[in-house]
Amino acid sequence: PEINVRTYCKKREKHGIYFFSLDTPEPLTRLGGSSRYHLPYRKRRIRFQKESAHQVSVQSYRTDEQLDLDVRYCGTGLPPEDKDAELIAWTTERYHLFSVNRNGHLFHGEVHHPEWPVENVTFSLSCNRLLQHFGITHQPADLAHYSRGVDTFAAPLKATND
């Protein structure tokens, strides 16, 4: 399991994503992602539990066992409203990854994936401290959707010359 905090960005017409953090208990994922892609992986204990055929519960704990995230969600299987289509495409059709190494140098690379299948979601969020480390206060979601995911491939990153 993995939990990420990201933002959407653009550089020279390349629409991409930048990760503030990627949390996982998996040591090989953290090592590979940090060394090969300069991604900010953090060690976390993540409890992922399927509570019913459709409902999932996720809790994330820091290494000191403080709860960072507690959410329950359920994909409805229903497609999003047409009025949300442009925003959904803007957030999911990103084909570049940006990252910064420890020396502050910017890197980028292509990301390959099929279109994300998106559906409506119901959710209950009882704890979200994932953004506190960055000085950002959690705000209630204006819009939320769910995807069962797609396979992605990130090409090796290259240094950006500016």
Regions found by a protein language model. Give the residues of each.
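Internal, well-folded beta-alpha domain core
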Residues: N4, Y8-D162
